[in-house]
Amino acid sequence: MREIWPCAIRIFEHYRAGTRHGIHMDADGLLCAGEGLDQVTWMDVRIGAHLPTPRHGKPVEINAYWYNALRILARLAPLAGADGAPFDALADAVGAAFRRAFWRPEARCLRDVVG
C-alpha cells in the first residue's frame, strides 16, 4: 500500500486541482468535465464539429465513481500511514451535493448531467 499510495494521491490531487479536458473539482466537491469539442464520458459521439450527445458539466456516473473513490481512499489511508478523515469528510460533502444536484424527486430518478 505504501508503494501505490503516492500515485493514488497524485491522481486525487489532479482531479481536485484540475487536469486536461476541463476535469476539475467544483466548489461543491463534484467533478466537472468536458470543454469545447472534448467528449470525456462513454457518450463520446462527435461528428465533425457537432456533438450529438454533449455532456459537459457534471456527469452523474463520473460523480458516483468520484464519491466511491473518496471512500476507498479514506479506507486505504491508514494502511499507508495517512489520515483518512479528510477523504471521508469530502465524500460526505460530495454525497450531499450529489443528492442535491442529481436527484429528481418528481420523476424519482437521477439527472444525467448538470451544469
Annotate the PLM regions.
Residues 1, 58-60, 111:
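Substrate-binding groove/exosite segments of carbohydrate-active enzymes
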Residues 8-9:
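Phosphate/pyrophosphate-binding betaalpha-module
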Residues 13-32, 54-56, 65-115:
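Catalytic cores of carbohydrate-active enzymes
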Residues 34-58, 115:
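Acidic/His metal-coordination segments adjacent to aromatic residues that form catalytic metal sites
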